[in-house]
Amino acid sequence: MSSVPKRAKLDGAPADGNTSAAAGNNEEESEALEQIDACQNEIDALNEKASEEILKVEQKYNKLRKPCYEKRSELVKRIPNFWVTSFINHPQVSGILDEEEEECLHALNKLEVEEFEDIKSGYRINFHFDENPYFENKVLTKEFHLNSAAASENGDWPASTSTPIKWKEGKNLLKLLLTKPYGNKKKRNSEYKTFFDWFSDNTDPVNDEIAELIKDDLWPNPLQYYLVPDIEVEPEDEEDNEDNDEEAFDDEDGEDGEGEEEEEDEDDK
């Protein structure tokens, strides 16, 4: 039972006539608190049961969705650059894509998210690649083990693991991008500098925003991002610079004109 909240003591003892009434009130309050506590226990039990049933329903529909995802994956292969386009058009995921990584991701022919049997325990993200000039791997996988039921091979949880990337000679993007200036045109709204930096990092599996975006947003419906219309981006600040130059030129002319007028006035005098 929940502990009874403390109440401020009243100054002075109650009059003899009120003693029995106060005792009756305390007894009634204690009984009510016991009943409230019993109700709360019942609610908690129902919530727990609901979670278990929701989990079973989710597992059932994960199996039902699987053939649809597989069919979609086969159809996607007929569309060149489907996944890299979806990545580029995603407002958050695009924030960690370097230009050379975009070139690399043109070889991405399939994205796949697999939830573990107990969906609360974790999931894996599989990136399938065609032959490409950057690495030897055909599949790169990042796994998330979020509770003891899905502890990683060394028994740790929460934990995440990533496939070691077999970079081709001179093509290690993690090393190449370390030497590039960080001032890219794209705004970086993430703690990760680049896509492969995110893929290789396993320090905080519980709060991996990019993984959650891929699993819960990009994977269920990539078409909404692939079909985002192209937006023409005007060269940054060119017009503003021209306007500023014109204003500066006008200001100089104005100052020169004022100087000439003052000289003419002095000559007239």
UniProtKB/Swiss-Prot annotation:
InterPro entries: NAP-like_sf, NAP_family
Gene3D superfamilies, alphabetized: 1.20.5.1500, Nucleosome assembly protein
Keywords: Phosphoprotein
Phosphoserine modifications at: 30, 148, 152
Region (Disordered): 1-33, 227-269
Cellular component annotations (GO), alphabetically ordered: chromatin; nucleus
Biological process annotations from GO: nucleosome assembly
UniProt GO MF annotations: chromatin binding; histone binding
Domain of life where this protein originates: Eukaryota
Biased composition (Acidic residues): 231-269
Quaternary organization: Interacts specifically with B-type cyclins.
Family: Belongs to the nucleosome assembly protein (NAP) family.
Protein name: Protein SET
